[in-house]
């Protein structure tokens, strides 16, 4: 049982004096789990973290998904060291970016052409620009609760109706921009049809997380993605897959390979950087040729395709391409899911677990979760208590009821067994 967070608390107090909110991303604060000082980590190795107080944790945050090969994986670390020794930024073309682009195309046949950027936010933002350039239209359709980065156009929430023009979800986003976004519920074909009947002639693209990762792990209903493609193309719109979370997480070829559905454009990030900042987007040749210098849709970046990120990404994919990687993640994920459910039954705790291979979400509810409304109507207060109990047990989770637990190639059966025991102790405390 971890009881000493003295240095983390002192560091957070100091951070509040210098960094807005004491964190560099709001998801790192503990606001969503009842408040308190977030734990400051000092180093990571494999599936483990050590904080500034010297406490050790089994990590299921995985930096919100990118660290699928574990912390400081030797193959990835070696590649980063080599890149650092050779110079991390040139501002010129390199052989590394060509090699990495070819690897991505091999993994995802829908990528005729690829362009590297520096984040998932940038990748999504640019696919939208490209879709608008290609179609000559301005509106974007997205699904409620799906997060696509913090650019103005996608930082919107649904209005009062089941399908509606967006309303700003952040101060600083003009209403006029939010009104270019139509939001509909995930997994609801009828509402999608209604929205396209009304606005389809104005829609440049439908933006989709093919497997949702931002209100927990939620899979599409059978046939849903196929109908999204069919309806979008009938309306003259493109389909953009946001695979920032899903690419290389569930299968080497991403969700589009796993589910057998092909988008027009794909946005990538997280895992493909091996832990370094990265994004990429790609798609059909005739669409991607809208991008400068070939076409009128401008996109550029000083850091884009830098040798350090390219090297880390290549090394990460080389690890993931090894035989048995995804089978191991699935096996450990199934073991963890089974153990959590057994502990919940033992201690009479109401939960639902959504799992796909090596990622899962624990919702404090008995309801089936298949859309954002369902995820919202879960017990956040109970999750907050569970989160802090697990932290004291040495289990590092994301501080939000909406986030996933991510397994890495470095987790072991022993890690899972300890985690299940810790879940049991946390549930026992919650049941009192």
From Swiss-Prot:
The keyword Repeat does not apply. One of its GO terms (cellular component) is cytoplasm. Its cofactor is pyridoxal 5'-phosphate. Keywords: Cytoplasm, Isomerase, Porphyrin biosynthesis, Pyridoxal phosphate. Its EC number is 5.4.3.8. The keyword Protein transport does not apply. Its main location: cytoplasm. GO terms for biological process: protoporphyrinogen IX biosynthetic process. It is an enzyme of class 5 (isomerase). GO terms for molecular function: glutamate-1-semialdehyde 2,1-aminomutase activity; pyridoxal phosphate binding; transaminase activity. The modification N6-(pyridoxal phosphate)lysine is found at residue 270. It holds the Pfam family Aminotran_3. It catalyses: (S)-4-amino-5-oxopentanoate = 5-aminolevulinate. It is found in: Cytoplasm. InterPro entries: 4pyrrol_synth_GluAld_NH2Trfase (IPR004639), Aminotrans_3 (IPR005814), Aminotrans_3_PPA_site (IPR049704), PyrdxlP-dep_Trfase (IPR015424), PyrdxlP-dep_Trfase_major (IPR015421), PyrdxlP-dep_Trfase_small (IPR015422). Homodimer. Belongs to the class-III pyridoxal-phosphate-dependent aminotransferase family. HemL subfamily. This is Glutamate-1-semialdehyde 2,1-aminomutase 1. It comes from Bacillus cytotoxicus (strain DSM 22905 / CIP 110041 / 391-98 / NVH 391-98).
